[in-house]
Amino acid sequence: MTKACYVGVAGKARKVKKIYTGVANKARKVKKAYVGVGGVARPFFSAESKLSYYGTVTPLDDGRAYFQATSVGGYGLFGGGYAGKILSTVDAYSTSLVHSTPTSLSEVRYDLAATTVGNYALFGGGHTTDSTTEDDIFLPTVDAYSTSLVRNTPTELGERRAVLAATTVGNYGLFGGGYLILKNMSYISFPTVDAYSASLVRSTPASLSEAKYGLAATTVGDFGLFGGGNDRYHEASSVVDAYSATLVRSTPTALSEARNNLAATSVGGYALFGGGNGSDTVNAYSTTLVRSTPSVLSEERHNMAATTVGDYGLFGGGGFLRETQFSSTVDAYSSTLVRSTPTGLSFSRGGLAATTVGNYGLFGGGTNYNAYYITVDAYTVDGGG
């Protein structure tokens, strides 16, 4: 149990967040501190953060699913999505969870990807529908939001595509994979990776080792990782591609099982790939790309959302294979890969999006196929002390 420690500052009790002690002329962080009471050691300080469910916050402007989220500066952003109609709405949440609606995306779209590089949040790719023919239109568009939420439109992706993934490594935001559907209803999947510098200059590093879509991406140490997905034959893939901070590609050990529609986030020194169609497996990659397999998710599910708050990587919501049932479960992995299950989402749903702003991890939107939701659930950590 986390204990509280206070110190007097200008006549007010202030909570102690961190304590350091000198060891061999170096400042070492105190993780736990005890005091003797009646001959028994009693804890009075812990630097370990405690994860808790904060509750629901101001809802999204539009209920929707199949959208994306990222953070820039002091804002968490949710952009695009589908709710029976295709949307361009962007919702912003400040570090104090104040909700606002900045300029919308330049085009309505869903099944897009998002990441942040430098001072810009990027939303790239996706698809929409021709209002006359009702044909799918796949988009190469990238919208960039500054730390003051001013939108601009940098160079497009090299290929128009949807169901791609994005992450950031070093000074580059990467968009990888994706697919488009031709008028004859055949699919083309892509191995393409587009890189955007902190000044939004686009380049094209080495492609993924295979064309695929429905993959997941995250970053650990000096590597951006793209894992899983469907290959060009629509079969689940286990391949993981790693990009260094200089955009050199390598292929570390594959996922322990092939899967698509999985989720990814990073915590401590680990990148986590969790779930996927019919899977409860979680694979962890260290900063040296050594793969391990921590405890499985508490339920096998796909179309989850994932984010990290404090020392916890969270996987929330999702659907069950071949069933019209959805989950409200949240699985939390600590920086030492210990799994716990905090209070779940306020209700079950899949196709949601997640990001973190300040001390809050936010899970927004989603669907259960009967409705599209505006709800945003927040998780927080209490910090040290």
Task: Please describe what each predicted stretch is.
Residues 30-32:
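Trimeric viral appendage architectures of receptor-binding fibers, tailspike depolymerases
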Residues 2-12, 21-22, 35-385:
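Kelch-like beta-propeller repeat domains
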